A protein has these predicted regions:
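N-terminal beta1-alpha1 ligand-phosphate binding loop
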Residues: 3-25
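A structural signal for isolated positions on well-ordered beta-strands in alpha/beta enzyme cores
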Residues: 5, 34-36, 88, 121
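Short acidic/polar alpha-helix capping motifs at helix-coil junctions
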Residues: 8, 38-41, 73-76
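Short, surface-exposed acidic/glycine-rich loop or hinge patches that mediate macromolecular interfaces
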Residues: 9-13, 42, 60
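A short beta-strand-loop structural module common to alpha/beta enzyme folds
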Residues: 31-44
Length: 173
């Protein structure tokens, strides 16, 4: 049975709620896939390294800051050899209040994962957003799913519902 490590960090609970939706949808689409929902707080590299399929959820705080638990996890993350591992990212941000830093956190971590041999999946269009800049953006695409529940919460479920089947297909699951 395939398993996915779904790691997230949260301070307000918003990223956790999205992670729970992601897990629920995966299990609805592919009941034979085990999804382990894991908060990143006080985790070690080995907790993440055991998975071949990873979905990582991160909010971006203020002026492009990483959520505290993800900031602390950087040394652990840098110790992981992602060769052969498949990763997809989702991020939460505010495209208006912090337009110059929209969903930067997933860009920072996606770059590290790719530089450490990981394969990224789940790129999404950046064209339906009104931000100025994002470290998560490459040309007209984000390196994952960017969600703005502050300003576009009405689009969140539809975006997740479109993204998850694409990620599972891209993962080969």
């Amino acid at each position: 049975m395939a398993s996915i490590g779904l790691f997230y960090g949260t301070d307000t609970g918003n990223t956790e709620q999205v992670a729970e939706k992601v897990k629920s949808l995966i299990q609805e689409i592919k009941p034979d896939i085990r999804v382990d929902l894991i908060e990143i707080y006080q985790r070690k590299a080995a907790d993440m390294a055991q998975y071949d399929f990873l979905i990582i959820g991160q909010p971006t705080w203020y002026d492009g800051e990483l959520q505290g638990d993800w900031e602390e996890f950087i040394p652990e993350f840098e110790a992981i050899d992602f060769t052969g591992k498949q990763l997809a990212f989702f991020g939460l941000g505010d495209q208006y209040g912090y337009a110059a830093y929209f969903c930067d956190a997933i860009g920072v971590y996606a770059d590290m994962a790719e530089n450490q041999g990981g394969t990224l999946h789940g790129f999404t269009s950046a064209l339906d957003y009104e931000h100025d800049f994002s470290k998560a953006q490459r040309a007209d695409q984000f390196v994952g799913l960017c969600l703005d529940i502050d300003n576009q919460d009405d689009l969140t479920d539809a975006r997740i519902n479109q993204w998850i089947p694409e990620v599972l297909t891209s993962f080969g699951l």
